[in-house]
Amino acid sequence: MKIVEVKHPLVKHKLGLMRENDISTKRFRELASEVGSLLTYVATADLETETVTIEGWNGPVEIEQIKGKKITVVPILRAGLGMMEGVLENVPSARISVVGVYRDEETLKPVPYFQKLVSNINERMALVVDPMLATGGSMIATIDLLKKAGCQSIKVLVLVAAPEGIKALEEAHPDVELYTASIDQGLNEHGYIIPGLGDAGDKIFGTK
């Protein structure tokens, strides 16, 4: 599995600000979107382009355009919605697919409860977004759903990832690509990432 930890100074700075315990909902939400945008920039660096001719201000001019690669952004409810706007800033024509998976706090197992995928997802590259890759259960369950629907090109974008989650994802889906702003220390006894960001969903939606 291709694993990319994005170490750009802007990414590290913004993620560092997100780790502050008393950060406001507004600021956390803004930063989640901004880091999501920067991760998208890196994750889409291998998109193919083609040369086309358009009419410029002084006559015909050749330009580079992305070569017909359709994209669907797949936020995992609910926290993934916090990164979606930043992703769409870079790929505004992308369609949106939504998957709902929550983690049972006792068993730590993923429980799928909702999915609404674009009809031609088999023709699209999926950018799956979720702030945290902890145990990997929710992400694996989401990718299971996408592959069952025919999606063959999948990239995962997360703000922070635990080594345990990375290992589980690689074992389940070695063909996907992972882009993260940080590979953190690991999980505590409750399955939360250390140092992590706390509960990203609560911080994005202000439901502490």
From Swiss-Prot:
Cofactor, free-text remark: Binds 1 Mg(2+) ion per subunit. The magnesium is bound as Mg-PRPP.
Per the record, the pathway is: Pyrimidine metabolism; UMP biosynthesis via salvage pathway; UMP from uracil: step 1/1
Activation/inhibition comment: Allosterically activated by GTP.
Task: Report the CDD domains cross-referenced here.
Answer: PRTases_typeI
Q: Which GO terms describe its cellular component?
A: cytoplasm; cytosol
Write down the Pfam families for this protein, in alphabetical order.
UPRTase
Q: What positions belong to coiled-coil segments?
A: none
Keyword presence, Calcium? no
MF GO annotations: GTP binding; magnesium ion binding; uracil phosphoribosyltransferase activity
Catalytic activity, EC:
2.4.2.9
Q: Where does uracil bind?
A: 193, 198-200
In terms of InterPro entries, this protein maps to: PRibTrfase_dom (IPR000836), PRTase-like (IPR029057), Upp_B (IPR034332), UPRTase/APRTase (IPR050054), Ura_phspho_trans (IPR005765)
Which reaction(s) does the protein catalyse, per the Swiss-Prot or TrEMBL entry?
UMP + diphosphate = 5-phospho-alpha-D-ribose 1-diphosphate + uracil
Q: Where does 5-phospho-alpha-D-ribose 1-diphosphate bind?
A: 78, 103, 130-138, 199
Q: What class of enzyme is it?
A: transferase
Please give the cofactor(s) recorded in the UniProt entry for this protein. Answer: Mg(2+)
The record's Gene Ontology biological-process terms are: UMP salvage; uracil salvage
Q: Which UniProt keywords apply?
A: Allosteric enzyme, Glycosyltransferase, GTP-binding, Magnesium, Nucleotide-binding, Transferase
Q: Which family does it belong to?
A: Belongs to the UPRTase family.
Functional summary from the UniProt entry: Catalyzes the conversion of uracil and 5-phospho-alpha-D-ribose 1-diphosphate (PRPP) to UMP and diphosphate.
Q: What is this protein called?
A: Uracil phosphoribosyltransferase
- Which organism was this protein described from? Yersinia pestis
